[in-house]
């Protein structure tokens, strides 16, 4: 678990580090797709469960992969997000997911970890 700041938000989202996940994801709600200048965009809210801080984002859709699940498959929306982990600011792909049933609102995958961070499973909050 590590604190991750979804910029420009001021409070961190506790996020699970998952070296098995290719793409990072974040708990988003009120997700609405729309078109702007002939391109696909999405508007969504991020709400920090710990602090109640809320921010409405509008992002261009980077891709929409189909994710296979046990009970079928679902299409996910992937956008580029600016995040801060420790002292490092990273622009990376995040899939927008309903993570309300999970303990952590964010999941940090290999797309952020590779070449930037070393994972030590014996530690938590190592970036603080």
Residue ranges and their predicted role:
Residues 1-128:
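Pepsin/retropepsin-fold aspartyl endopeptidases
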């Amino acid at each position: 678990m590590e604190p991750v700041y979804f910029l420009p938000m001021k409070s961190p989202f506790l996020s699970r580090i998952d070296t098995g996940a290719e793409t990072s994801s974040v708990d988003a709600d009120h997700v609405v797709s729309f078109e702007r200048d002939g391109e696909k965009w999405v508007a969504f809210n991020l709400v920090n469960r710990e602090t109640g801080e809320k921010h409405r984002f509008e992002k261009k859709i980077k891709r929409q992969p189909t994710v296979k699940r046990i009970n079928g498959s679902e299409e996910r929306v992937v956008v580029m997000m600016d995040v801060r982990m420790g002292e490092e600011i990273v622009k990376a792909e995040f899939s927008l997911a309903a993570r309300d049933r999970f303990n952590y609102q964010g999941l940090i995958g290999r797309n952020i970890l590779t070449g930037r961070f070393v994972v030590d499973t014996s530690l938590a909050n190592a970036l603080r």
